Amino acid sequence: MDYYRKYAAVILVTLSVFLHILHSFPDGEFTMQDCPECKPRENKFFSKPGAPIYQCMGCCFSRAYPTPVRSKKTMLVQKNVTSESTCCVAKSLTRVMVMGSVRVENHTECHCSTCYYHKF
């Protein structure tokens, strides 16, 4: 019986150490690894050999926080949570024609800025 208690104690200690290490990382440390930084990446659909087309792709930040009481009083429809986010957008671009008559923006530089067009 003492034999099994020792194994149970070792398992519990190992589990608690693992959970301590897991909770010591800042929030989002593991999820950010899947999300690349905001920069121009080649658009395979519009690119041709020798004439690549680049589009801004990547992640920026978003956050939500409680709406301040002073701000709530000015809202027509009061909301308890306020959110803000930035999107990966082109800082500079050139317009080019592809496939004969399709006008496409070739992004040359990207940055995180206000989101104007939200993707669903």
Swiss-Prot record:
Compartments in which it is found: Secreted
Keywords linked to the UniProt accession: Disulfide bond, Glycoprotein, Hormone, Secreted, Signal
Point out the signal peptide segment: 1-24
Molecular function via GO = follicle-stimulating hormone activity
Q: Offer one example of a GO biological process linked to this entry.
A: positive regulation of steroid biosynthetic process
Q: Which residues are connected by disulfide bridges in this protein?
A: C35-C59, C38-C88, C56-C110, C60-C112, C87-C115
Under the heading InterPro entries, the entry gives:
Cystine-knot_cytokine, Glyco_hormone
Keyword Secreted included in the entry's annotation: yes
For whether the record's keyword set contains Disulfide bond, the answer is yes
Annotated glycosylation sites: N80, N106
* GO terms for cellular component: extracellular space; follicle-stimulating hormone complex
The parts of the chain that form a coiled coil are none
Which family does the record claim for this protein? Belongs to the glycoprotein hormones subunit alpha family.
Task: Show the PANTHER family listed in the entry.
Answer: GLYCOPROTEIN HORMONE ALPHA CHAIN, GLYCOPROTEIN HORMONES ALPHA CHAIN
Q: How does it assemble?
A: Heterodimer. The active hormones thyrotropin, lutropin, follitropin and choriogonadotropin are heterodimers composed of CGA, a common alpha chain described here and a unique beta chain which confers their biological specificity to the hormones: TSHB for thyrotropin, LHB for lutropin, FSHB for follitropin and choriogonadotropin subunit beta/CGB for choriogonadotropin.
Q: What does this protein do?
A: Shared alpha chain of the active heterodimeric glycoprotein hormones thyrotropin/thyroid stimulating hormone/TSH, lutropin/luteinizing hormone/LH, follitropin/follicle stimulating hormone/FSH and choriogonadotropin/CG. These hormones bind specific receptors on target cells that in turn activate downstream signaling pathways.
> What name has this protein been given in UniProt?
Glycoprotein hormones alpha chain
This chain's source organism reads: Macaca mulatta (Rhesus macaque)
UniProt gene name: CGA
